[in-house]
Curated annotation (Swiss-Prot):
Microtubule inner protein (MIP) part of the dynein-decorated doublet microtubules (DMTs) in cilia and flagellar axoneme. Forms filamentous polymers in the walls of ciliary and flagellar microtubules. Required for normal sperm mobility. It is a peripheral membrane protein. This is Tektin-3. PANTHER family: TEKTIN, TEKTIN-3. The gene is TEKT3. InterPro entries: Tektin-like, Tektins. Expressed in spermatozoa. Expressed in airway epithelial cells. It is found in: Cytoplasm, Cytoskeleton, Cilium axoneme; Cytoplasm, Cytoskeleton, Flagellum axoneme; Cytoplasmic vesicle, Secretory vesicle, Acrosome outer membrane. It comes from Homo sapiens (Human). Microtubule inner protein component of sperm flagellar doublet microtubules. Interacts with TEKT1, TEKT2, TEKT4 and TEKT5. Interacts with CCDC38. The lineage of its organism: Eukaryota, Metazoa, Chordata, Craniata, Vertebrata.
């Protein structure tokens, strides 16, 4: 800035700019004392009595800065600056020592800041390296633990797979023996089993066909003679069913455990091979605070071991039951001869009676279906007629509605109005008549449909009875079973 006045106090027209750096640029410092104070032009001949004029410059006029004077003291450009009586106003604010001390302070602060920054950088670099090595070691330890966990899971998984294969094999073997026992009871075990299956299937007859006929009497006689074999087979069959349920429950636990092990193996193996550069890594805030674990390594291993022990126990019981069933089939295969021909003759007579009744029902059903078709056609024609009349009714009512909007005296009850009203009543009566006829036709159709349903049900009953007697029962009794079939092989 331009200094004006005496050496006692220096007055500036504007405040000193705040430096943005520790040391301002030389150009800034040099220019800060030039042409900063616009004032009225002072002639070069102006002399200041208390200071030689060679040490001061005459202030130049700057259009960007207002003169340093009050409103009442403003003068024109050609007016000279009067002498100021207050000498203290023009003295400088700082001494050279202050200036040097300020610079020295800035230098020291700069050195201190740079020293602290350098120390921080060195410490930070060392900290980064230490933490990097520590993090890598921690990750390596975690990776090793994951690898050990994967090996543990793999061991128990192989144990489960081995036991599961054994259990599946035993379950399949018991299932085969059970099927042989069922075949002996239902299809191939001598007269007792044939009679038992025939009675069982004939209980599936429906409606009026559930009669106590000659066939049932002969079958009951056949069953009574060999009831003891039947009870023994059913007892062992129930045991086999219960054992299969136990085997499947144990197998289910093994399969569930194996599925969990496979999932855990896949997850832990993925985690074991996961690296910093792997795809799919990301931030999951707060996941380390979520403890969703439900077991410890000891309880985890004991859980799988208990499942394997339970499976082994069930396999031993299943093998013993298979041996008992095998012995039972061999014993009961030699105890079966009774009333075979009488039962077959009774079946033949009953099948003929049922077939004749079925043919008559089919004839009535065909006629009923034809009548239903005709009635449905009538209903459709009535509906079409009603729909056609509805269009006429809409037009007439629309005309009446539009004519209600005639203004004032134009609302005349003329011939057109009367004809429209009559037309609405006439069409409405026609629709009502057709709707009544439609209801009558629908009632008739419902009656026909009910009769059809009754005939169809009766036909299904007869067809079911024929299927049971002819296909189910007689197919089992076409020939006497041989020894292999009596023990369940066929």
């Amino acid at each position: 800035m331009e200094r004006v006045g005496c050496t006692l106090t220096t007055t500036y027209a504007h405040p000193r700019p705040t430096p943005t750096n520790f040391l301002p640029a030389i150009s800034t410092m040099a220019s800060s004392y030039r042409d900063r104070f616009p004032h009225s032009n002072l002639t070069h001949s102006l002399s200041l009595p208390w200071r030689p004029s060679t040490y001061y410059k005459v202030a130049s006029n700057s259009p960007s800065v207002a003169p340093y004077c009050t409103r009442s003291q403003r003068v024109s450009e050609n007016t000279m600056l009067p002498f100021v009586s207050n000498r203290t106003t023009f003295f400088t604010r700082y001494t050279p020592d202050d200036w040097y001390r300020s610079n020295l302070t800035n230098y020291q602060e700069s050195n201190t800041s740079r020293h602290n920054s350098e120390k921080l950088r060195v410490d930070t670099s060392r900290l980064i390296q230490d933490k990097y090595q520590q993090t890598r070691k921690t990750q390596a330890d975690t990776t090793q633990n994951l690898g050990e966990r994967v090996n543990d899971i793999g061991f128990w998984k192989s144990e489960i797979i081995h036991e599961l294969d054994e259990m599946i094999g035993e379950t399949n073997a018991l299932t085969d023996v059970k099927k042989r026992l069922e075949r002996a009871l239902m299809e191939t075990e001598a007269p007792l089993q044939v009679a038992r299956e025939c009675l069982f299937h004939r209980e599936k007859r429906m409606g009026i066909d559930l009669v106590h006929d000659e066939v049932e009497a002969q079958l009951l006689t056949e069953v009574d003679t060999i009831l003891c074999c039947q009870e023994r087979m059913k007892l062992h069959l129930d045991k086999a069913i219960a054992q299969l349920a136990a085997n499947r429950a144990s197998q289910h636990e093994l399969e569930k455990d194996l599925s969990d092990k496979q999932t855990a193996y896949r997850i832990d193996d993925k985690c074991h091979h996961l690296r910093n550069t792997s795809d799919g890594v990301g931030y999951f805030r707060g996941v380390e605070r979520v403890d969703a674990t439900v077991s410890v390594p000891e309880s985890w291993a004991k859980f799988t071991d208990d499942n394997i022990l339970r499976s082994q126990s069930e396999r031993a019981a299943s093998a013993k039951l298979r041996d008992d069933i095998e012995n039972l089939l061999v014993v009961t295969a030699n105890e079966m001869w009774n009333q075979f021909n009488k039962v077959n003759l009774s079946f033949t007579n009953r099948i003929a009676e049922t077939a004749d009744a079925k043919n008559k029902i089919q004839t009535h059903l065909a006629k009923t279906l034809q009548e239903i078709f005709q009635t449905e056609m009538t209903i459709e024609s009535i509906k079409k007629a009603i729909k056609d009349k509805t269009a006429f009714l809409k037009v007439a009512q629309t005309r009446l509605d539009e004519r209600t909007r005639r203004p004032n005296i134009e609302l005349c009850r003329d011939m057109a109005q009367l004809r429209l009203v009559n037309e609405v009543h006439e069409v409405d009566d026609t629709i009502q008549t057709l709707q009544q006829r439609l209801r009558d036709a629908e009632d008739t159709l419902q009656s026909l449909v009910h009769i059809k349903a009754t005939l169809e049900y009766d036909l299904a009953v007869k067809a079911n009875s024929l299927y049971i007697d002819q296909e189910k029962c007689m197919s089992m009794r076409k020939s006497y079973p041989n020894t292999l079939r009596l023990v369940g092989f066929c």
